[in-house]
C-alpha cells in the first residue's frame, strides 16, 4: 500500500513538470523521482540528500546528487536557479522549515511541496 501511495505522488509531480525543466529535488533519497523525471520528461535534475548512502545509490542510477543538509545549505543557490524545486514528503524532517520554505521560493521559479499523511482514514 505504501508503495502505491508513493507512486501516485510521483505521478502527480511528474504531471506538473514540463519537459526539459531544470529541477532541484530536496531530500531526493535514492534519486528515484529524479530518474523518473529524466526518463519521462527529459529534465535536467539535481538532488540534495542528507544520507551519504542514499546519495551513493542516486549516483549509481546516473542522478546528480550531493550530500548536504537543506537546513543549512540553500543560501549558495542564486535566485531562480531552477524551474522547479521539489520538497516531496521532506518538510517534516527539517529543523528550520520556515528557512527552507523561504529559500525554495527564492531559488525556484515554481515549487512543489508535499506532506505525508501520518493518519490516513480507513477505507480510502
Annotated model-derived regions:
Residues 4-20:
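Conserved alpha-helix/loop element of class I SAM-dependent methyltransferases that forms part
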Residues 27-29:
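Class I SAM-dependent methyltransferase "Motif I" SAM/SAH-binding loop
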Residues 31-35:
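Glycine-rich SAM-binding Motif I of class I
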Residues 36-73:
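Class I SAM-dependent methyltransferase SAM/SAH-binding core
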Residues 73-79:
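Short conserved loop adjoining the S-adenosyl-L-methionine
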Residues 86-95:
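A short SAM/SAH-binding and catalytic strip from SAM-dependent methyltransferases
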Residues 98-112:
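A short glycine-rich, Lys/Arg-flanked "PGG" loop and its adjoining helix->strand segment in the class I
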Residues 113-124:
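Conserved class I S-adenosyl-L-methionine
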Amino acid at each position: 500500500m505504501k508503495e502505491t501511495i508513493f507512486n501516485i505522488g510521483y505521478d502527480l509531480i511528474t504531471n506538473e513538470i514540463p519537459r526539459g525543466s531544470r529541477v532541484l529535488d530536496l531530500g531526493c533519497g535514492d534519486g528515484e523521482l529524479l530518474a523518473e523525471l529524466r526518463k519521462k520528461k527529459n529534465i535536467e535534475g539535481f538532488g540534495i540528500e542528507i544520507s551519504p548512502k542514499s546519495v551513493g545509490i542516486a549516483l549509481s542510477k546516473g542522478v546528480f546528487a550531493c550530500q548536504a543538509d537543506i537546513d543549512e545549505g540553500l543560501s549558495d543557490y542564486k535566485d531562480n536557479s531552477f524551474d522547479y524545486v521539489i520538497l516531496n514528503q521532506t518538510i517534516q524532517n527539517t529543523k528550520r522549515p520556515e528557512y527552507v520554505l523561504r529559500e525554495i521560493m527564492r531559488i525556484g521559479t515554481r515549487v512543489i511541496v508535499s506532506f505525508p499523511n501520518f493518519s490516513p482514514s480507513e477505507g480510502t
